């Protein structure tokens, strides 16, 4: 398991799309496949919906990411002043499974 370096943030009243770039973890010609699982760790304050592998290219933090090299999901809720951990699990075409913890700060 790895911990994403960037802490994402959202306002408690917002519903936001979160995207995660896996380009640097994928081997040459490897892609993300199958279903994506997202789960909040420790509490149930957040509502996490619509997890999936992006079917087209997307831009994440100013970087163009190829189709099937990133995942996205929607997050709502949370209490202001708290930092949450969201675990993302996704499989690849080379039979790897990535499990990553993302930090989400609610302001």
Outline where the language-model segments fall.
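Extracellular acidic loop/turn motifs
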Residues: 24-35, 43-47
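Short, solvent-exposed loop/turn segments at the edges of extracellular beta-sandwich modules
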Residues: 91-95
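C-terminal edge beta-strand
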Residues: 96-107
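Surface-exposed, short loops/turns at beta-strand junctions within beta-sandwich domains
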Residues: 75-82
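Predominantly extracytoplasmic/ectodomain segments of secreted and cell-surface proteins
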Residues: 1-31
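Short, conserved beta-strand segments of beta-strand-rich sandwich/propeller modules, principally
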Residues: 83-87
């Amino acid at each position: 398991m790895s911990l994403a370096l960037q802490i994402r943030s959202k306002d408690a009243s917002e519903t936001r799309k979160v995207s995660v770039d896996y380009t640097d973890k994928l081997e040459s010609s490897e892609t993300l496949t199958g279903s994506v699982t997202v789960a909040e760790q420790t509490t149930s304050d957040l509502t996490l919906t619509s997890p999936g592998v992006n079917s087209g290219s997307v831009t994440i933090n100013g970087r163009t990411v190829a189709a099937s090299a990133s995942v996205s999901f929607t997050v709502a809720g949370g209490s202001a002043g708290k930092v949450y951990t969201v675990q993302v699990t996704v499989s690849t075409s080379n039979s790897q499974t990535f499990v990553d913890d993302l930090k989400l700060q609610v302001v």
